[in-house]
């Protein structure tokens, strides 16, 4: 299996983003951080975790978004570093959307040709009273159907309307088909987190080896 690593830098007038990813876990780093020393020191430990198998450090400037991306990386088995400086003086839209786009681009680059993997993945994840389901296809046909049933205007400092939009942006850039549904639950934090964890479980299954070196498609290509 290849290293399945990528580094993406995405700079616009609205955001500056750097992402390092390894779909296999293991060591990764960003040598030239775009974050100032104060930002690095004030980074949330809640969204940073280093073990022998994974390195995760998420700093988008939006706490709940950090928390969700951390959960996605952890349960997908990725190592992931995300640095973002966004125009949060306006609102959280550009930061959230652009992080989804950049993460999708990094995922797509790290994955490379879809060959020798299951391609399809299904995941369920509970969090207390909440239960979510996710289905993934490494199809190269970007499509996202997201139904989380969120009712609050915000969770922490993240607008709830941006949570499905992040997933849509990620799927579009990664060229995935994803269906993510929260089946039950009354706490919007739990509903969101269970959805991201279910997606992680589904992605992890879709990337698992299928015992061949074939392209898992009747077309013979997924590109």
Swiss-Prot record:
Pathway: Amino-acid biosynthesis; L-histidine biosynthesis; L-histidine from 5-phospho-alpha-D-ribose 1-diphosphate: step 6/9
EC number: 4.2.1.19
Pfam families: IGPD
MF terms (GO), sorted A to Z: imidazoleglycerol-phosphate dehydratase activity
Transmembrane domains' residue ranges: none
Name of protein: Imidazoleglycerol-phosphate dehydratase
Gene Ontology biological process terms in this record: L-histidine biosynthetic process
Catalytic activity: D-erythro-1-(imidazol-4-yl)glycerol 3-phosphate = 3-(imidazol-4-yl)-2-oxopropyl phosphate + H2O
Encoding gene per record: HIS3
Swiss-Prot/TrEMBL keywords: Amino-acid biosynthesis, Histidine biosynthesis, Lyase
